[in-house]
């Protein structure tokens, strides 16, 4: 009897072990899967002094142009970062956005609105060719700023490591990439800042850091760095970046400028208000109409309004009181 019981327990334990191993195997298969790729891309490598450009395009002139622009951006960024690449930086270029979304160089899904990605550990820049050369050049310059940022943190030898990037607010990281790839003056960013001034909603640095969902880091970050560069010069940018990586932006402000982040917020806000207030002097017309749909009587996101033919109603898309977007009707 004891032998039968022992055999039963032995078989039971064997089945448990097989089940556990099978689950682990299935889990490994699930998490080890690559993204769906619809065709094989035969990449080639174009070497430049500082980059390995991976491409599969048959357009030789485009490849040479990308290689040239990469080196141009390197020279520009190197002057500000005061850093050089100890090894060539990989740049992986896709012919279009759908094929870029299938890349396995970056883990995770890539959204339609993502223009490019820079991977942290190897600083691999992954991007598609955009619709026009100006957009492609901008995305390339933006992503190469991130490559420099990662290299400074990992290889700069200034008591920083990659995990120090967690101390740097998103608006500071992305704003710097926009500032170095676009410059001090940008009509698109100015449009955002004029809107913030008109609505009396110029944020403090604390709000930018804690409410990035309300204040787009790219635009507000670029505006802040433009203020810093115009007021103190671009030479203070890297000291502020490094100190922020080591201690956080609030302590970094004190070490670099001698006053706290709230004072810096006030100076930035005053400069913004003075700049856009002067533009209103030539404005004689007043906004026509009243606000029918806003965050107080609808959702936080209200888009695509359409007025009925008789002008009595307006329909719009909103996430009001819902987990997803739906169609709503309001009196006009």
Which residues are covered by each model-predicted region?
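Bacterial Sec-dependent N-terminal signal peptides
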Residues: 1-32
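Juxtacatalytic substrate-recognition/specificity segment
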Residues: 28-163, 169
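Active-site-proximal alpha-helical
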Residues: 53, 171, 176-186, 194-261
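Beta-rich catalytic cores
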Residues: 135, 301-303, 323
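Multi-bladed beta-propeller domains
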Residues: 278-300, 330-332
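Short coil/turn segments that connect the beta-strands within blades of beta-propeller domains
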Residues: 310-312
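Beta-strand C-termini and the immediately following turn/loop, strongest in propeller blades
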Residues: 315-321, 331
